[in-house]
Amino acid sequence: MDKKYSLQHSIFLACSFVLLIWFIKLFEAAFGVSFSHMGVYPQTASGFFGILTAPLIHGSFNHTLANTLPVLLLGSMLFYGYPRSRWWVLSAIWILSGLGVWLFARSSYHIGASGLTHGLFFYLFIAGIIRRDPRSSALLMIAFFMYGTMFWTIFPQAPDISFEYHLFGALSGAGCAIRCSHWDPLPVEKKYSWEIETAENELDEEDPVIGDQWKTAVNEHPEFETAAGQYKKVF
């Protein structure tokens, strides 16, 4: 689970999902069928199973195209930046966003990967704030620069757009960030040779008054020394 993916491998995984949703859309167009009934329909038994399939189904080519780049970029960033938590996060956003729609959304079929993309965005954004290491901060800034408008699309827009999927995707991503972002180890800080040499030189420098005698000095009054190596005050 904690296997680290290269950037190329991360992009490949995100591309695989994009190809899958395009294959489904092209299949619908080629055979004159629609899989919209496989979306989430709130508070119905058949619509409950749409939690698993709805992110794969899109209403039109424009709908599919609108989700292509966000899935590719945000998915690649998740796979690359969070090697331990990525699959848990992806699964949780997928299931929880659909469950929220099934419980609370309007009575209609809700389809599309936009709930997933909102979840990924909010995960990357909040995880970057929590962790504050260089990699997470960079992913946060890229995600915000590209898709900061997702803060507004969680509110009602056009009647044919499922803002509920956006909202519950965002809540799922935020919850995952709070719960899972610490699962991934902090990246190892690189030390350049000149930094190491500077640190060693500072340690080797002699005190201008006592020279390097402090390195070998013996404490002549151990009774005044505490466990932390500091001296007690005597009044």
Regions flagged by a language model, labelled:
Residues 7-88, 98, 103-110:
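N-terminal TM1-TM2 helical hairpin plus the immediately adjacent luminal interfacial "cap"
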